[in-house]
């Protein structure tokens, strides 16, 4: 059979495996890639290729992740798997591999374990929108009632963290049996059922270009006779000449009109997501705009000073702090293109945060920044990164 050629026209969805150590995340990843390649075309990867995860840098933090790709009948999936628990924490907080949905792997022999719970909490905090469950190692449990019990526990745990536990697809199977080509109920058919659950339960993500216009401002220029130009990379949506935009963050929100868009010194009618462009603003003075603000479609994003966040604190080995920090610590928070000083408040009962920890905290900034839940930031001290975080909830 000739190799199926890679189709770019299928919708692209990002997923990943989460769950407790040794519950079978990497084996399942290999099984999905292998069985999809066999059934729907594409290239298979074996367990050893996935397990030897290469190091990546995201915001100066070293993370080990493996990426595999596979096709279902209707989609192309990019799947991320991490070898160690710390890699998951870093990956999810930095957004190095954004997930449109996660596959929670839970061994039926163990039931939910500490990292099962922690990964569900992290998914909630960093805004992973959907979770599908694969109950693994079901071939090793001969009591149907025990399987029912474990499934119920997992569903309750999901509900605890505001995921719809009762409606979440739970697939029973054995990643190892599937990988070995087993034709029984827990073999290949369980993995195909999982892929079908991904296809139906995780909605197609909205593309950046279809979202509301947003462009972080990197630079501001004054062009004599033309006015003020702000430059940056369009993060989402499209901006057209003649449209109204808001300048949000740091100062009071201003509304202005786009009188020109240029890219590489050429005039355009519009700037689109992913493009670096200059936007000419009508009647805006050079001193009214600064780096760190954003241009946005009116009414779509608001400036805030207070938020709750999930933060990973770099270890000493990663170039982070050598000592813990306490309540009231005031570092710089780097959002998009600029640093803003903020004070942190730790949760009750937490005295200090050690390098290498991940922690929930509340932050109050000295200037407002345009933000929504899911926005990533770095924590810096004297120009070096000491942490990475994500906005879990805006509070003021």
UniProtKB/Swiss-Prot annotation:
The UniProt record gives the binding positions of Mg(2+) as 26
**Domain tr-type G per the UniProt entry, residue ranges:** 10-206
Q: Write out the ranges of the annotated region (G1).
A: 19-26
Listed GO CC annotations: cytosol
Q: Name one GO molecular function term.
A: guanosine tetraphosphate binding
What PANTHER family has UniProt attached to this entry? ELONGATION FACTOR TU, MITOCHONDRIAL, ELONGATION FACTOR TU-RELATED
Name by which UniProt lists this protein? Elongation factor Tu
> Species name for this entry?
Acinetobacter baylyi (strain ATCC 33305 / BD413 / ADP1)
